[in-house]
C-alpha cells in the first residue's frame, strides 16, 4: 500500500471496485419434472424458463440439462449485466438470495403452467420443506463441479446419506409427512404415487418400504 493514508484508501477503494466488478456471471440449478419423458417437451420447457427468467431481463444465459441417476436438472449460467444496444450495461443486476428466490418461484410457475398445457400430472413447489410445513431435511444437490472433484463428491454423498437416515427416522415416527410431500408434487395424486414416494424414501430397501407403507 501507499505510505500516504489518503492514497492508500483510494487504492484500496479502486481495488474493491475492481474486484466487485469481476463477478460477471451467476449460476442456478432447477429440478425438472420426472414426468416429462418427451425430449422435445423438455427442450420447450427449458427454453421457456431461460427466456422468461433471464432473457426478458436483458441477460445472456447459457444452459444445459442433465439427467444423472434419474434426477433431471437444468443448469444455467447467466450474466449479471444486461445486454443493451450491443453492449453490456454499466449497471449490474443485484443477485442476492431474494432475487434468486424470485427467479426460482417464477421458474416453478412456468413449469406448472407448461404441465397444465401439455396435460402432465405434476406440481412444482418452489417453497422450502419448512415453508410447506414438511418436517424433512432437503438433500444437498451435487453440482456439476462436484462430479469432477472426488473429495467434494464423497463429502456431499456422505452428508446426503446422513440426511436420508434422519429423514427415515422422522418418517417412521410421522409417516403422514409422505402424504404432505406427495400432495405438493402432484395436481391429483393416487395410491401409486404414494407408494412410489415410499419406495424412494426407503432407498429401495423392501423391508423399510413395507414398514413405511404399513404405517400410512
Please give the residue ranges for each predicted region.
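Solvent-exposed residues in well-ordered beta-strands and their adjoining turns
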Residues: 31-35, 79
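Broad gene-expression machinery/nucleic-acid interaction feature
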Residues: 25-27, 58-62, 71-75
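A short, contiguous, amphipathic alpha-helix enriched in charged residues
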Residues: 34-65, 101-110
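Glycine-rich, often proline-containing surface loops adjacent to acidic residues and nearby aromatics
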Residues: 21-31
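Single-stranded nucleic-acid nicking/binding segments centered on His-rich, glycine/basic loops
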Residues: 1-21, 39, 65-72, 79-216
Amino acid at each position: 500500500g501507499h505510505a500516504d493514508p489518503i492514497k492508500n484508501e483510494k487504492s484500496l477503494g479502486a481495488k474493491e471496485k475492481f474486484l466487485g466488478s469481476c463477478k460477471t456471471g451467476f449460476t442456478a440449478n432447477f429440478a425438472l419434472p420426472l414426468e416429462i419423458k418427451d425430449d422435445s417437451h423438455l427442450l420447450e420447457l427449458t427454453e421457456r424458463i431461460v427466456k422468461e427468467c433471464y432473457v426478458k431481463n436483458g441477460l445472456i444465459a447459457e444452459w444445459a440439462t442433465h439427467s444423472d441417476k434419474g434426477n433431471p436438472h437444468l443448469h444455467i449460467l447467466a450474466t449479471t449485466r444486461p445486454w443493451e444496444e450491443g453492449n453490456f450495461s454499466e449497471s449490474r443486476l443485484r443477485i442476492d438470495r431474494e432475487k434468486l428466490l424470485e427467479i426460482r418461484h417464477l421458474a416453478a410457475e412456468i413449469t406448472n403452467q407448461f404441465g397444465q398445457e401439455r396435460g402432465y400430472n405434476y406440481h412444482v413447489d418452489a417453497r422450502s420443506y419448512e415453508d410447506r410445513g414438511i418436517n424433512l431435511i432437503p438433500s444437498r444437490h451435487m453440482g456439476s463441479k462436484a462430479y469432477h472433484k472426488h473429495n467434494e463428491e464423497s463429502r456431499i454423498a456422505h452428508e446426503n446419506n446422513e440426511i436420508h437416515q434422519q429423514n427415515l427416522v422422522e418418517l417412521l415416527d410421522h409417516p403422514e409427512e409422505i402424504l404432505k410431500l406427495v400432495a405438493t408434487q402432484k395436481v391429483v395424486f393416487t395410491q401409486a404415487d404414494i407408494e412410489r414416494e415410499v419406495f424412494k424414501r426407503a432407498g429401495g430397501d423392501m423391508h423399510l418400504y413395507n414398514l413405511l407403507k404399513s404405517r400410512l
